[in-house]
From Swiss-Prot:
<keyword id="KW-0238">DNA-binding</keyword>
<keyword id="KW-0805">Transcription regulation</keyword>
<keyword id="KW-0678">Repressor</keyword>
<dbReference type="GO" id="GO:0003677">
    <property type="term" value="F:DNA binding"/>
</dbReference>
<dbReference type="GO" id="GO:0005525">
    <property type="term" value="F:GTP binding"/>
</dbReference>
<dbReference type="GO" id="GO:0005737">
    <property type="term" value="C:cytoplasm"/>
</dbReference>
<dbReference type="Pfam" id="PF06018">
    <property type="entry name" value="CodY"/>
</dbReference>
<feature type="region of interest" description="GAF domain">
    <location>
        <begin position="1"/>
        <end position="156"/>
    </location>
</feature>
<dbReference type="GO" id="GO:0006355">
    <property type="term" value="P:regulation of DNA-templated transcription"/>
</dbReference>
<dbReference type="InterPro" id="IPR014154">
    <property type="entry name" value="CodY"/>
</dbReference>
<dbReference type="InterPro" id="IPR013198">
    <property type="entry name" value="GTP_trans_reg_CodY_C"/>
</dbReference>
<feature type="DNA-binding region" description="H-T-H motif">
    <location>
        <begin position="204"/>
        <end position="223"/>
    </location>
</feature>
<dbReference type="InterPro" id="IPR036388">
    <property type="entry name" value="WH-like_DNA-bd_sf"/>
</dbReference>
<dbReference type="GO" id="GO:0045892">
    <property type="term" value="P:negative regulation of DNA-templated transcription"/>
</dbReference>
<dbReference type="InterPro" id="IPR036390">
    <property type="entry name" value="WH_DNA-bd_sf"/>
</dbReference>
<dbReference type="Pfam" id="PF08222">
    <property type="entry name" value="HTH_CodY"/>
</dbReference>
<keyword id="KW-0804">Transcription</keyword>
Length: 258
């Protein structure tokens, strides 16, 4: 069996391999499952399964169905996990199903270890390990807690990337709106009121007559938005123009103007 140092180095190699790219949670699950000989689940604070790996021979049909079909744990069970504020090791299931205490577990002597994933002074998720008959050792727990730290950092990085992407999309929309004349802005508001959701068919002449502007104003407004990359348009000839919104912040920013 590899030493703790060797196992830690394996985890570090996953980090080094990723470089500036996000770490793949499935890679962490695969490694932990192999070196700890257990089932591994990385669960978000809301119960979504971010990564998982079943160890060969340790497959529970009930859990497998949840993981593969639902891709999330039931709320009541996730709440139990979130109530664990520090590592809880070798918790027995008393031969009962974790999702239904009235139902017997198909596999006896199941032991679970729950490791909270924290970062920036908040709970980000849970690292859940499960195996049968053999208890998790202190060495196993050190590796699990180190892994939880790595996962926490990656979740925080992912959140920050998402925040930055949202800000970028909003800024692009605001710049695009800023290029419009008053009449073009008025035309745009009517155009997107006509759309059914994020895409639809636009007949420029109908909107021009309805608003009392020229068709060229509508065409110019659409061209500016298309140049900014916030929409995609395709002429269908006499039928009109098919428009699809590419930036999901567009409608939100237009509502603020009204």
């Amino acid at each position: 069996m590899s030493s703790l140092l060797d196992k830690t180095r394996m985890l570090n190699r996953i980090l080094q391999k990723s470089g500036t790219e996000p770490v793949d949670f499935e890679d962490i699950c695969d490694l932990l499952s192999d070196v700890l000989a257990c089932n591994v689940y990385i669960i978000s604070r809301k119960g979504k399964i971010l990564g998982s790996k079943f160890y060969s021979g340790f497959e529970c049909d009930e859990v497998r169905e949840v993981v593969l079909k639902e891709n999330r744990f039931p709320d009541f069970y996730n709440n139990k996990l979130l109530n664990v504020n520090e590592t809880l090791s070798n918790s027995p299931n008393h031969d009962k199903c974790v999702f239904d205490n009235l139902k017997d577990c198909s596999i006896n002597n199941k032991l679970s270890t729950i490791v909270p994933i924290n970062g920036n002074r908040e709970r980000l998720g849970t690292l859940l390990l499960a195996r049968f008959d053999k208890e998790f050792t202190d060495e196993d727990l050190v590796l699990a807690e180190y892994s939880a730290t790595i996962i926490g950092l990656e979740i925080l990085r992912s959140k920050q990337d998402q925040i930055e992407e949202e800000a970028r999309k909003k800024a692009v929309v605001q710049l695009a709106i800023g290029t419009l004349s008053y009449s073009e802005l008025e035309a745009v508001e009517h155009i997107f009121n006509e759309l059914d959701g994020t895409e639809g068919l636009l007949v420029a002449s109908k909107i021009a007559d309805k608003v009392g502007i020229t068709r060229s104003v509508i065409v110019n407004a659409l061209r500016k938005f298309e140049s900014a990359g916030v929409i995609e348009s395709r002429s269908l000839g006499m039928k009109g123009t098919h428009i699809r919104i590419l930036n999901d912040k567009l409608l939100e920013e237009l509502k603020k103007i009204k």
